[in-house]
């Protein structure tokens, strides 16, 4: 079988969780530049992704939000999430000043904080490079929008 697709095995002793990207996936930052952190409070909720995430949470999945946003905007990000997502979540953010690519940052967070603690049933992401990275880890990744940037 030349087209074998690697999928990570589940550990039945671990809780199930989903990974969800923020910008371009759950949060739509219309009218702001990516680094305009003072404006993220005005982002629109991508209601279709939010509906799926809420449904998975109701079925017992932990919701893990993983973003390339700098840690400096944690306050406004959690304020937006609490007002818009309205379910329990765990939030991982890029360390302040970390200039590495999103895929590098998210892979490191996954390896250090998430991989041995949860069965990741699904990942929601928009950026091609990050989608590819998740799939290389054997995770089912749903790409929610065009992400060639």
Language-model features and meaning:
Residues 71-119:
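Substrate-recognition "cap/lid" segment bordering the active-site pocket of phosphatases
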Residues 12-13, 59, 113-120:
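Glycine-rich phosphate-binding loop signature in dinucleotide/nucleotide-binding domains
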Residues 1-20:
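Non-catalytic pre-domain segments flanking phosphatase-related domains
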Residues 34-64, 71-76, 104:
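Short, acidic loop-to-helix structural element flanking the phosphoryl-transfer center
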Residues 110, 118-149:
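Acidic, Mg2+-coordinating phosphoryl-transfer loop and its flanking beta/alpha structural elements
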Residues 62-64, 90-92, 122:
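A structural signal for isolated positions on well-ordered beta-strands in alpha/beta enzyme cores
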């Amino acid at each position: 079988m030349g087209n074998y697709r690697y999928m990570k095995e589940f550990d039945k002793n671990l809780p199930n969780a989903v990974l969800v990207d923020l910008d371009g996936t759950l949060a739509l930052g219309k009218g702001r530049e990516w680094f305009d952190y003072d404006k993220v409070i005005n982002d629109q909720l991508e209601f279709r992704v939010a509906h799926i995430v809420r449904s998975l949470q109701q079925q017992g999945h932990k919701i893990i939000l993983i973003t390339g946003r700098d840690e400096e905007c944690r306050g406004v990000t959690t304020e937006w999430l609490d007002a818009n997502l309205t379910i329990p979540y765990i939030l991982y953010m890029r360390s302040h000043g970390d200039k590495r690519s999103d895929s590098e940052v998210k892979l490191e967070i996954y390896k250090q904080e998430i991989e041995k603690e949860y069965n990741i049933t699904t990942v929601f992401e928009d950026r091609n490079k990050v989608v590819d990275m998740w799939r290389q880890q054997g995770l089912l990744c749903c790409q929610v929008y065009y992400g060639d940037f």
